[in-house]
Regions:
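Short glycine-rich or small-residue beta-strand-to-loop segments that form or flank ligand, phosphate
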Residues: 180, 256-259
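Catalytic core of soluble alpha/beta enzymes
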Residues: 181-252
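Conserved, mostly hydrophobic/aromatic
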Residues: 41, 136, 175, 217, ...
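Hydrophobic residues within beta-strands of alpha/beta enzymes
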Residues: 65, 134, 173-174, 215, ...
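Helix-rich catalytic cores of soluble enzyme domains
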Residues: 119-204
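Alpha/beta catalytic barrel-like cores
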Residues: 1-129, 142, 230, 234, ...
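Short, histidine-centered active-site or binding-site loop motifs used for metal coordination
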Residues: 99, 140, 179, 221-223
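A structural motif corresponding to the C-terminal end of an alpha-helix
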Residues: 61, 125-131, 165-171, 204-212, ...
Length: 337
């Protein structure tokens, strides 16, 4: 295995910076565009990603950016490939390599992630395009009689196989088992499912002999279900999240990054701030953010496909990055919004 992956993993979770998730699939991106009246075309998606990636000063707050297959093939107006643009800013380009979810046979309401077939050859192509790390997402829904242990173990196995192939090809794998926010479950239920899921993932990684020092975990925060009547506050979220990690994540892991998973931008930042404050310093693992919607939503609301609004939209992006950087040092406050 290429030992340079340790260096890349360390740079991705460097203190004070986060990772932008700009890897929404075409259908996901189109859905967001539709909501704000932006034309759903490849060119508009390219313009949107260009707005984010060309923002002046971005490198102060971002260590890496996760791209999508379409995006890593795109260029700026000046003809610079996005991956090269990031490299020039000393930001590490990565790529999401899973191919979405499909039904898990015999398990209604549960999904497994596709994309292992042909993965090694896709990775060779991405490496030639400049990518240095990969990401793969599994989804775990909480509902009546779900998740099943079968589903958790199957997704853990698939994540481990993906991680093994990634490291063999010289990439740092980001493994993302997302426990979904949808549902009316309590925070206690979310903690139980997240702990169980992470233990299964690390057992599968151990079995595949994946090197945890060259791997990053992308995790959900432990939250009450969206429709739960009793919503946990940020301090409760932090306590449940940190406890979950202490009970399930080996210390060798290079770092943990958080997904925002449908939280509002403010909620995600506030919860991150409380988690950082609670974690023992020096922490067992470096912690940072890897948000998508929680960074992009306010920016998209301003831009709405209008090139005259690019500067104002970039200012909103810069503001969210600054607020999350404050959260990484535990100094965020609501009145900074």
């Amino acid at each position: 295995m290429d030992t340079r992956i340790y260096e890349v993993a360390g740079q991705l979770v460097i203190k004070g910076k986060g990772i932008l998730a700009a890897d929404e699939s075409t259908p996901s991106c189109n859905k967001r565009f539709l909501a704000v009246g932006v034309e759903q075309t490849e060119e508009m998606r390219r313009q949107w990603r260009e707005l984010l990636l060309t923002m002046p000063g971005i490198a102060e707050f971002l260590s890496g950016v996760i791209l999508y297959d379409e995006t890593i093939r795109q260029q700026t107006d000046q003809g610079i490939p996005f991956a090269k643009l990031l490299e020039e800013k000393s930001i590490i380009p990565g790529v999401k390599v899973d191919e979405g979810t499909g039904d898990f046979e015999g398990h209604p309401g549960e999904k497994i992630t596709k994309g292992l077939e042909g993965l090694a050859s896709r990775l060779k192509e991405y490496r030639a395009m400049g990518a240095k790390f990969t990401k793969w997402r599994a989804v775990i829904a909480i509902g009546e009689n779900i998740p099943t242990q079968d589903l958790i173990e199957k997704n853990a196995e698939i994540l481990a196989e993906y991680a093994e192939v990634s490291q063999d090809e010289g990439f740092v794998p980001i493994v993302e088992p997302e426990v979904l926010l949808e549902g009316n479950h309590t925070i206690e239920k979310a903690e139980e499912v997240t702990t169980n899921t992470l233990r299964a993932v690390f057992a599968a990684l151990h079995e595949k002999r994946v090197d945890l020092k060259g791997l990053i975990l992308k995790s959900s925060m432990v939250l009450s279900g969206k429709d739960c009547l009793q919503q946990a506050d940020a301090k409760q979220v932090a306590a449940a999240t940190v406890r979950t990690f202490q009970n399930s994540v080996p210390q060798e892991v290079a770092g943990i990054v958080f997904l925002s998973g449908g939280q509002s931008p403010q909620q995600a930042t506030e919860n991150l701030n409380e988690i950082v404050k609670l974690v023992r310093q020096p922490a067992d693992w470096p912690l940072t953010f890897s948000f998508s919607r929680a960074l992009q939503e306010p920016v998209l609301q301003i831009w709405r496909g209008d090139s005259a609004k690019i500067k104002a939209a970039q200012q909103a992006f810069l503001k969210r990055l600054k607020l999350n950087a404050a959260a990484l040092s535990g100094t965020y406050a609501k009145d900074m919004e």
